[in-house]
A protein has these predicted regions:
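Hydrophobic alpha-helical transmembrane segments in multi-pass membrane proteins
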Residues: 24, 190, 252, 257-430, ...
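C-terminal regulatory/interaction regions
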Residues: 2-13, 17, 21, 31, ...
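Membrane-interface helix/helix-cap signal primarily in integral membrane proteins
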Residues: 2-7, 64, 73-271
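Membrane-helix interface and helix-disruption motif detector
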Residues: 29-40, 61-63, 369, 427, ...
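Small-residue packing motifs within transmembrane alpha-helices
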Residues: 16, 20, 68, 75-78, ...
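Alpha-helical transmembrane segments of polytopic membrane proteins
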Residues: 37-47, 373-374, 434-439, 498-500
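Helix-loop-helix transmembrane hairpins and adjacent membrane-interface loops
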Residues: 2-96
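Alpha-helical transmembrane segments of multi-pass integral membrane proteins
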Residues: 379-488
Length: 528
């Protein structure tokens, strides 16, 4: 309890609340099917609080710890109820027979035999009337002469099929495909061979207007991304380089080949392909650098930071609203709002608040691999930076190198157990890989923006394109050299119990190192 009290009254109280909320969601997921009624949960909560009060009173604990315990239990209960309500929501009642459906394409991926489209439905035909429906489904279309044409986001489809709920399909590592579809807002699956038709551009636009406001914004942003991706076709680079650039800058990984994914996985640099705080932070830093003269005027601070918030969310929509990018978008939004008032805010509190907001909207997000890896890595970095400052308080030369190595090692250690559990691999030379990938990513993000902005200047765009192609070649050659090193990737298959033990050990090591750093700080205080 003293640790809880110190955490709550310390500098990161929101982190304490977020952990309590997460524990409630995890408990609800584990035992929610046994306890799923509010009339059971609330008395259970009151009973636990009563036992906690007796325990504190018996041990002679401070009275000020009781509110901390009550707040903790309250957020555990809120997390428990949030997940229970989410899990008990009824599934969509799909018609039992085939119907004529219409909707807009959201995204497209390909397999050897089919094209798999995520379709945002608008309506289906029931007799002589149209029944409105706003759900997303995966539509698998058998490849043929008509399906060979390229689908684009926003295109309207008319198809005759029966939609079913996703079938449970669990991989050996515990990945549940049906739950993954549900977490991504997909409520059904269907297959058509030839009974489908793509509507005209005019019909697609009319159908798009019948979508919800959020879906319209998403489809508009994806259409804009498609136009930007077409400009990458002018690059003097091979298809693999263009695929990497599309993933690094616009979050489009639909064209990524298994060999490219394997290369980045073996070198421990897969995180640069998933848009996150690294990419968004570079864009915000560049924007702040350009807007720095305006920040000298107090009246312009609010418009500048509000413009930054608008840019953050435009970029998030443009790149597909991935979990890791949503986390960083919320954190940078909070940072901008604090800066409007002349305050910096605490990064750990911003991280925790971002987690709470995302989990309130969708509690099942807690079990998403991207959510877990993103939050764990950032939590480890933010928790470890004070220790680095304590160990090297006055080092200025080479500080960037020290910070870079520290962040790479800490993020890799924090996510290694989960990466090994989900992907059964561990990259040995991740530091070498990141030393190549991150500087190249900075250059690619900067020059890709110049490339896209110079679309009206063909000569300038060609010069920038050559620079991009050169950086892509350096990135590919460097990572390929790291991947060819002996034992570059180890195959591991830990159990979930082993993963829990690893994190217990990591937490204990963190506590010991933090106490050591605190003692070093006290030792530096002069005595008079």
């Amino acid at each position: 309890m003293p640790l809880l009290y110190k955490a709550f009254h310390g500098g990161s109280p929101v982190l304490f609340l977020a952990i309590s909320f997460i524990l409630g969601i995890a408990a609800s997921s584990a035992i929610g099917h046994f306890v799923s009624q509010l009339w059971v949960e609330i008395p259970l909560f009151l009973f636990i609080v009563f036992l906690l009060w007796l325990l504190l009173r018996r041990k002679g604990a401070s009275v000020s710890m009781l509110p901390v315990a009550l707040v903790s239990m309250l957020f555990v209960l809120l997390g428990f109820i949030a997940y229970a309500l989410h899990a008990s929501a009824p599934d969509v009642a799909w018609p039992k027979s085939k119907k004529l459906w219409c909707g807009n394409i959201v995204s497209v991926s390909e397999t050897k035999a089919t094209k798999r489209c995520v379709v945002a439905l608008v309506a289906y035909k029931e007799g002589d009337r149209l029944v409105r429906v706003r759900q997303q489904v995966t539509l698998s279309i058998l490849k043929g002469s008509e399906a060979s044409a390229r689908f684009r986001p926003g295109d309207a489809l008319l198809f005759y099929a029966r939609i079913d709920h996703p079938r449970p399909y669990v991989l050996p590592n515990g990945f549940d495909y049906a739950k993954w579809l549900k977490r991504n807002g997909i409520a059904g699956t269907c297959f058509v061979a030839n009974r489908w038709m793509r509507l005209s551009a005019e019909s697609s636009e009319k159908l798009l207007q019948r979508q919800s406001l959020l879906m319209r914004c998403r489809l508009r942003s994806l259409q804009l991304r498609e136009k930007l991706l077409e400009q990458y076709g002018r690059l003097p680079a091979d298809s693999a380089g263009r695929q990497v650039l599309a993933a690094l800058t616009l979050g489009d990984k639909s064209g990524m080949t298994p060999s490219i994914r394997e290369l980045y996985a073996r070198t421990g640099t897969s995180h640069v392909l998933a848009l996150s705080g690294l990419h968004l932070g570079m864009l915000i830093s560049l924007l702040m650098l350009l807007m720095r003269p305006l920040l000298c005027f107090k009246r312009l601070r609010l418009p500048v930071f509000l413009s930054a918030v608008a840019l953050i969310w435009c970029f998030a929509f443009l790149t597909g609203l991935s979990i890791s990018l949503l986390r960083s978008a919320v954190m940078y939004t909070l940072w901008c709002l604090f800066m409007c008032r002349g305050r910096h805010g605490r990064s750990l509190n911003n991280l925790a608040l971002a987690a709470i907001l995302l989990l309130i909207v969708h509690p099942d997000t807690l079990f998403d691999v991207g959510f877990q890896l993103s939050f764990l890595s950032v939590l480890a970095i933010l928790s470890g930076m004070p220790m680095l400052n304590a160990l090297f308080p006055s080092v200025r030369k080479g500080r960037i190198v020290i910070d870079f190595l520290f962040i790479s090692v800490v993020a890799q250690l924090a996510t290694a157990p989960l990466v090994a559990y989900y992907f059964n691999s561990y990259s040995v030379y991740f530091i070498l890989g990141n030393c190549i990938a991150i500087p190249c990513t900075c250059l690619l993000l900067t020059f890709s923006m110049l490339f896209l902005m110079c679309s009206g200047l063909p000569f300038v765009q060609e010069l920038v394109g050559r620079v991009l192609a050169c950086v892509l070649d350096v990135l590919h050659v460097g990572l390929s050299a790291v991947a060819r090193l002996p034992f570059s990737s180890l195959w591991v298959s830990p159990s979930w119990q082993s993963v829990c033990v690893c994190y217990v050990v990591l937490v204990l090591l963190y506590v010991l190192l933090r106490r050591k750093c605190e003692s070093m700080l006290w030792a530096r205080v002069p005595c008079y």
